[in-house]
Amino acid sequence: GTCKCDDDGPDVRTATFTGSTEFANCNESWEKCLAVYTPVASCCRKKK
């Protein structure tokens, strides 16, 4: 399933996710998540 940035932290409008805002690739052992409030944005967060 798709993870969402907002599940684990502030939404994209206030930034500072669990991970970092990232439009390309995420670091190894991190996963790309989508932001609910801004469809064009995504973030990376550590895999659980």
Curated annotation (Swiss-Prot):
The keyword Disulfide bond applies. Pfam families: Toxin_4. GO terms for cellular component: extracellular region; nematocyst. Disulfide bonds join C3-C43, C5-C33, C26-C44. A synonymy between H.magnifica and R.crispa is controversial. Binds to site 3 of voltage-gated sodium channels and inhibits the inactivation process. This is Delta-stichotoxin-Hcr1b. It comes from Radianthus crispa.
